[in-house]
Amino acid sequence: VVDPAPDRRWTATYAAWADELPGWLAPSAVAATVERPMAWGTRAHRIDRPYVVLDTERLRESLDIAGAEVVADRARELTAKTVTLTDGRILDGRRVIDVRGITRSPAFAEQTAYGLVLDESRCQGLEPLFMDWRADNGAPADAPRSFLYAVPLGGGQTLLEETCLAGRPALDGAALRDRLHHRLRSRGIELAGDERVERVRFPVGGGRPGRFTFGAAGGFGHPATGYSVAASLTAADAVAAGETVWPASARAVHRLRAAGLRALLALPPTDLPVFSTRFSLCRPPRSALTF
């Protein structure tokens, strides 16, 4: 395992639909579960599907790599069976899997978000929200849209995050911060100014399915939503065993999801809440673009 900082803490918030997570996932890796999350598009509706927020530190601890050699360095060059490190060393293996993620590029749409972590006691009356597209964040009606994402983190804390689902270019952190502050004030939630901040920016396109790539780099990220953790965890054992995880049917779904991203980027801002409402009302088996 080549990692430039193998001991660093994972600080991002990871979440997934419960039915997409593998059965071997340690129960301790789950920080909170929302049984029927609320979504707001053109109207309020509940999604009949449990949504899980993960404890990132316990998730990291539960992923056992005992027996693997960990090398604290960066990969400079890869082939199917070798890795050249930045210090010049060359590592050999039966297979090399690239999990380095996706390099940012103006050609790729991105998801961005700005979030604050508050004590639950300060969020009275605000229930967990999967996507809340209501227009109370102070943005002009014709501006690119963003939504509020509000989920429990466990331990009496809640994440409130203003999110740009996908943009090319995406909304920047300053714009999302201002929108979040405006939205929270409009809902009677006061800020102290010392809240922990979460910033998000990552490409939602550019992953390439294949035998030697995995995670976001391997196309496991959902192009239209950015979700990738559950798909990566579920496929990890098969990839490690050298099994094929990209049959023709999976590649077809990947292409359809990429088409969904293109459609999403082309929508006028006022149509995004309509799209979200109609999409969220679809049951998972009917939708190849499952969030």
Locate predicted features.
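Conserved mid-domain beta->alpha element of the FAD-binding
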Residues: 205-261
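Long, low-complexity C-terminal extensions of enzymes
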Residues: 237-291
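An N-terminal, globular interaction/scaffold subdomain
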Residues: 45-59
